[in-house]
């Protein structure tokens, strides 16, 4: 577990945390929910940037050279159960994972973002329109295909916490429609036969 933590509330807080960690040569970790099966967000002995309280979200019409249509902006603390509910209230859906308590912005999107709707809409990284981030040198910026495009592409699928600390993500929203799913389970009552 982290030895120290900063409850992040702004870009300035992140920049101060980054500066502190650099000046004192302290390992830095970034954590929202901690859903990481290899524990990268825990960082033993690190200074943790706890992103969980960046939980603003909004739905709006987005316009850029590459996409015009409905979109959702989610703070780094948003979990899927939060955004799924709010998206339904706006008549749209956003891509997400199966587990509703996973955070949307960190490792999910920045590691590609596979989920139940990927066959219909692509991976979450393919639906990401922009990232609001703080770079290691403390710059607060937007990364999109037209603004800071190298950082945008790096954040889109190279893993969370690798290139910048992401404060929010803007992702395409799709018109809500009916979906179907199935669950298949086999029960083996004989432990000698698998």
What role is predicted for each listed range?
Residues 1-194:
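Soluble FAD-dependent oxygen oxidases
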């Amino acid at each position: 577990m982290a030895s120290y933590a900063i409850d992040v509330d702004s870009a300035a807080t992140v920049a101060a945390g980054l500066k502190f960690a650099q000046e004192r040569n302290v390992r830095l970790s970034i954590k929202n929910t901690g859903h990481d099966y290899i524990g990268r967000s825990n960082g033993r002995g690190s200074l943790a940037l706890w992103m969980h309280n960046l939980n603003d979200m909004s739905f709006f019409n987005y316009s850029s050279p590459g996409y015009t249509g409905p979109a959702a902006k989610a703070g780094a603390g948003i979990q899927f159960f939060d955004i799924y509910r709010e998206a339904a209230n706006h008549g749209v859906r956003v891509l997400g994972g199966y587990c509703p308590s996973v955070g949307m912005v960190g490792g999910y999107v920045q590691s590609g973002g596979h989920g139940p709707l990927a066959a219909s809409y692509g991976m979450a990284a393919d639906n990401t329109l922009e990232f609001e981030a703080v770079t290691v040198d403390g710059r607060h910026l937007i990364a999109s295909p037209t603004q800071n495009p190298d950082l945008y592409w790096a954040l889109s699928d190279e893993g969370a916490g690798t290139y910048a600390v992401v404060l929010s993500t803007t992702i395409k929203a799709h018109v809500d429609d009916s979906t179907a799913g199935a669950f298949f389970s086999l029960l083996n009552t004989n432990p000698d036969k698998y």
